[in-house]
């Protein structure tokens, strides 16, 4: 534990501004729209986060979270629902964060995109494009992403402005849309399965 007062920093996805919440450990939350500070390699444990992040949190062990009735997982990583989180979602090493209030009005496929984008940061680090493509690849492979869902994601992401670490929302939309079309045209639901982060059956395998 580091001495002195420190902060968790979340980049507000909708407005692209950094919002700070006082916490006892100096680190940064990887919000779903990205952060170049390497928060997937340093941060609190889920126990520390649950203790320090305030009231109304809800913990979901891996394999227990459902989004609109659909069971989701990010390997063996748990998820914390935090209705007061500054963005739609976030990630520290080993666990994900979703803002239950912010995602409430979104379509199912956009919610799954946000969750999968955060999961992508666990494997890909802070790179925005890689996390976006991880989410699209997972959506195609796992069968929850269709053409309408891709358009919903684009509508949602296109409102975001770019900054030093975020490509502009419309650019992200086009990158994801192009990749989605490539996956569909390739006729494979197993795109990228040779990559270690895509060969995931962790919830069916033995605990380590």
Language model features with spans:
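Active-site scaffold of zinc-dependent metalloenzymes
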Residues: 80-107, 119-122
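Sec/Tat signal peptide C-region and signal peptidase I cleavage site
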Residues: 23-29
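Short alpha-helical catalytic segment bearing the HExxH-like zincin motif
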Residues: 110-118
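Long, well-structured alpha-helical subdomains associated
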Residues: 144-208
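Auxiliary, metal-adjacent structural segments of Zn-dependent hydrolase domains
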Residues: 31, 36-92
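Bacterial N-terminal signal peptides
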Residues: 12-20
């Amino acid at each position: 534990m580091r001495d002195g007062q420190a902060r968790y920093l979340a980049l507000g996805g909708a407005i692209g501004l950094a919002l700070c919440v006082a916490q006892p450990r100096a680190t940064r939350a990887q919000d779903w729209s990205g952060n170049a500070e390497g928060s997937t390699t340093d941060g609190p444990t889920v126990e520390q986060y649950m203790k320090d992040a305030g009231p109304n949190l809800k913990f979901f062990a891996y394999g227990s979270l459902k989004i609109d009735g659909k069971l989701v997982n990010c390997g063996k990583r748990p998820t914390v629902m935090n209705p007061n989180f500054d963005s739609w979602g976030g990630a520290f090493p080993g666990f994900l964060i979703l803002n239950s209030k912010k995602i409430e009005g979104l379509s199912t496929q956009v919610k799954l995109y946000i969750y999968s984008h955060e999961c992508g940061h666990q494997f890909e680090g802070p790179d925005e494009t890689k996390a976006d493509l991880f989410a699209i690849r997972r959506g195609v492979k796992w069968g929850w992403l269709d053409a309408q869902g891709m358009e919903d994601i684009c509508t949602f992401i296109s409102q975001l402005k770019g900054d030093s670490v975020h490509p502009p929302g419309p650019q992200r939309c086009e990158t994801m849309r192009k990749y989605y079309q490539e996956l569909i045209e390739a006729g494979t639901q197993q795109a990228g399965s040779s990559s270690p982060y895509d060969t995931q059956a962790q919830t069916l395998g033995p605990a380590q």
